[in-house]
Each structure stands twice: as structure tokens, then as C-alpha cells.
């Protein structure tokens, strides 16, 4: 069937694990985010149901893509972690977040590292196939083949480079 699932799992939210964000978000804003996310019993209850559905559809061969309605750039990390918690392998989640999503959106020059495509990628300090949370350990960012000056961007926008 020509069916694609873009899960939006109601996981614990980024507010429950914010230590890694301390260099990019002001402390007062972090506290507000934590307060807004702390008690979400309905979301936590529905996570189990949605995780079972995602796992079953994945096993049945339905194409799984990637997306989040989180407005923060770090929400993608949490969504990948939630997809692994739901039963997908880190390799399946990475494929969904990169090549599968690019294919779904018909953006042919991104999504995989292949000669002739735009060289947009990140370099990690640890293997995300071993632990999906390693996607947070970003060493370098490349856009169209050029390294991004993360420290310069952080200084320019009032935050840290990490």
C-alpha cells in the first residue's frame, strides 16, 4: 500500500532532560519549559498505545517517515529517542529521519550522502547506532559541504555553540 506514517509520539518531552540545552536556552526559559511539561498524564498514557501502533505498522512494512510538531530544534532528538523507545531500531529511525523523509517530500538532493547531492550533514562524537541519544553529541555541522562556525553563530545569537 502507498501509506506513510509520520509518528508524533507524546513522549516525555524535552523539558525532562534539559541539561544538554543549558548552553543554548536561558535558564529562566528552561524552568518555564520544565514547568509546562512536568505533568502530562494523558500524553504518557497514550504513548504506550501509539508505540504499539508504530511498532506494528513498522513490522508490517508500512513506510515510517519522521516529523515533530515541536517548535524547538532539539525536539527532533527527543522524537528519535521516542521512536526507539517505541520499538524501532536506531538505524530504522535514522533512515526515517533522513532518506525516507527527503524522499517523501520529494527533495532529491538531501537525505543521503551520495555524490552529486547537497553535502548537508552532521559529525557526531559517538555512534547513534549504539545509542540514539548520541545524536545529541554533535561535533560539527556541514551545510552544502562547508563547515558551519557554530561558536560564531552562538555568539551572534546570544547562546552557546552546543
Functional labels for PLM-detected ranges:
Residues 1-47:
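Active-site gating loops and adjacent loop-to-helix segments of metal-dependent hydrolytic enzymes
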Residues 14, 144, 148-162:
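Extracellular/periplasmic ectodomains of large secreted or surface enzymes and adhesion receptors
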Residues 16-17, 76, 133-134, 152-153:
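Short glycine-/acidic-enriched loop or helix-start segments at secondary-structure transitions
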Residues 135-141:
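Short, compositionally biased
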Amino acid at each position: 500500500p502507498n501509506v506513510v506514517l509520520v509518528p508524533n509520539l507524546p513522549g516525555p518531552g524535552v523539558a525532562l532532560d534539559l541539561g544538554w540545552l543549558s548552553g543554548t536556552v536561558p535558564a529562566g526559559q528552561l524552568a518555564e519549559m520544565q514547568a509546562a511539561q512536568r505533568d502530562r498524564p494523558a500524553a504518557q498514557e497514550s504513548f504506550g498505545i501509539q508505540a504499539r501502533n508504530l511498532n506494528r505498522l513498522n513490522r508490517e512494512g508500512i513506510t515510517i517517515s519522521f516529523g515533530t510538531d515541536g517548535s524547538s530544534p532539539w525536539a527532533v532528538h527527543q522524537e528519535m529517542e521516542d521512536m526507539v523507545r517505541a520499538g524501532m531500531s536506531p538505524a530504522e529511525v535514522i533512515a526515517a529521519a533522513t532518506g525516507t523523509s527527503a524522499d517523501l517530500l520529494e527533495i532529491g538532493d538531501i537525505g543521503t550522502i551520495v555524490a552529486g547531492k547537497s553535502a548537508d550533514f552532521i559529525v557526531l562524537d559517538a555512534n547513534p547506532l549504539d545509542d540514539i541519544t548520541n545524536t545529541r553529541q554533535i561535533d560539527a555541522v556541514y551545510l552544502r559541504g562547508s563547515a558551519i562556525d557554530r561558536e560564531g553563530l552562538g555568539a551572534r545569537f546570544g547562546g552557546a555553540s552546543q
